Every structure is written in C-alpha cells, then in structure tokens.
UniProtKB/Swiss-Prot annotation:
The keyword Isomerase is annotated on this UniProt entry: no
Coiled-coil ranges per UniProt: none
UniProt keyword Signal, yes or no: no
Subcellular location field: Cell membrane
Name of this protein: Protein LiaI
Cellular component aspect of the GO annotation: plasma membrane
Gene name in the database record: liaI
Membrane topology category: Multi-pass membrane protein
Induction statement: Induced, via the two-component regulatory system LiaS/LiaR, by antibiotics (vancomycin, bacitracin, nisin and ramoplanin), cationic antimicrobial peptides (human LL-37 and porcine PG-1), Triton X-100 and severe secretion stress.
Transmembrane domains' residue ranges: 11-31, 56-76
Phylogenetic lineage: Bacteria, Bacillati, Bacillota, Bacilli, Bacillales
Disulfide bonds: none
Record's keyword terms, sorted: Cell membrane, Membrane, Transmembrane, Transmembrane helix
C-alpha cells in the first residue's frame, strides 16, 4: 500500500470517526486542541528565538489548553491504537490464507464405529 495524501487522510478520517463515536459525536474538543497545539508550538519557537518571557507565557497557556483536552487526546490515541492493531490483524489474517487456525484432533479408535461398513453390508444383502 502506497502512503500518500489520500491514505493519510483516510486514516485520519477513521481515527476521528472512532473518536467521535467514543465522544458521542462532538467535535468541540478539536478547536481547543488545535489552538493549544499552535500556542505551544509558537511558545517553543519564541523561547528558542530568545524571547523567553513571552515564549514561556504563550507555551504555558498552550500546554494548559492541551492538558484540558487530555481526555480527547487519550480517546484519539485509543481509537488510533484500535484501528492500527485491527488493520495489522486484518493484514496478517489475509496473508495466512492456506493455514488453518483450527486443527481438530483425529477421532480416536475407541470412538469410531463401524456403522457405515455394516450398513453397506446390510444393503448388499437386500
């Protein structure tokens, strides 16, 4: 499978779909998550550029917004893990087409009956 924009977009749609399923259909936590992520990124960039006070303030506010969105992030992580391991199981399952996962033991000699042989002999006599 080639990874391109469509496959990444499809995966993100699956993850958000499962997340919405777990969250009851609300996209309300996406906005603070995005704003918090952007503010944290901007704070780190400002801190690296030498503007320590504004970098700490902006990054701190962004981190607080991300921490408040922690249940949403955990839900997305759980949904992503489920999708990933489910896909991995599906791909491994399709690779083993010829291998049977259930191999019953042969019937023991004590349990076998000779009914079929006796029935055929009975039919021949008729």
């Amino acid at each position: 499978m080639k990874i391109n924009k469509k496959t990444i977009g499809g995966f993100l749609l699956i993850v958000f779909g499962i997340s919405v399923f777990f969250g009851g259909g609300s996209f309300g936590f996406i906005i603070p998550l995005a704003i918090g992520s952007l503010m944290t990124y901007a704070g780190i960039k400002r801190f690296a550029a030498g503007k320590t006070i504004t970098g700490i303030i902006v990054g701190g506010i962004g981190a607080i917004m991300l921490i408040c969105s922690l249940p949403f992030v955990v839900g997305i992580a759980l949904a992503a893990a489920m999708v990933y391991y489910g896909w991995k199981l599906m791909k491994n399952g399709s690779a083993d087409n010829g291998v049977s996962s259930f191999d019953p033991e042969p019937a023991s000699a004590a349990y076998q009956s000779h009914f079929d042989d006796e029935w055929e002999e009975f039919l021949k006599k008729k």
